[in-house]
Amino acid sequence: MCIRDSFRNKQAIIAELFAQYESRVDAFLRRPEGRALTVADKTFYLEALLAAMWHYRFLHRDLEHLLETDVQLAERYRAFAARCMQAAAEIYRGFAAADILAMNDQQIEALVLNSWIILTSWVRFLCTVRSNPGDLSEELMRRGVYQILALEGGYVTDSARPAVQALLQRLHVPMSAVVK
């Protein structure tokens, strides 16, 4: 049975897929209770973001169009975006409290906004700089996650720098592989 047979129209399919995406992100984008954050948590968040970006890449590719054509989805998305940015700020505060990042509230706010912009526009960016826009891969998505981690570079504490550097190395994809 085709997925379209279970839904009234394309908007209903998109709404269901967005609900799945929203649920997936809400499940992992939260600060753990009762313990300090670690660099391993940073790895977890970045890998979870990568998996979500890859699995739901089509949502990000056509996001503006999808939101322009569906008022209810646009309202849900705005609430989701606000929740995500609030959760991300709390997570960054946790990394600062754990002496992994040295940041104040203004820096956290700027990093949250810049990270959100990268995450939500990365697929669209890839489609504009590649000769074959449909030629997306998980490796290319990993570079988007790398970009977020790179933004944090100036805030990484000396004690966390070796572990964060190792993570950067693991996530790095050469720009020559991104822009084709």
List PLM regions with ranges.
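Residues within the DNA-recognition helix of helix-turn-helix
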Residues: 6
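Amphipathic alpha-helical packing segments from all-alpha helical-bundle domains
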Residues: 72-98, 109-124, 143-154
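Conserved small/polar residues in nucleotide/adenosyl-binding loops
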Residues: 1-3
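Short, hydrophobic secondary-structure boundary micro-motifs
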Residues: 61-64, 76, 104, 164
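C-terminal peripheral helix-coil segments that are non-catalytic and often amphipathic
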Residues: 124, 128-180
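Amphipathic alpha-helical segments enriched in hydrophobic/aromatic and basic residues
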Residues: 10-21
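Secondary-structure edge/capping motif, primarily at the C-terminal ends of alpha-helices
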Residues: 29-32, 60-67, 95, 99, ...
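Hydrophobic alpha-helical connector segments
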Residues: 16, 30-59, 75
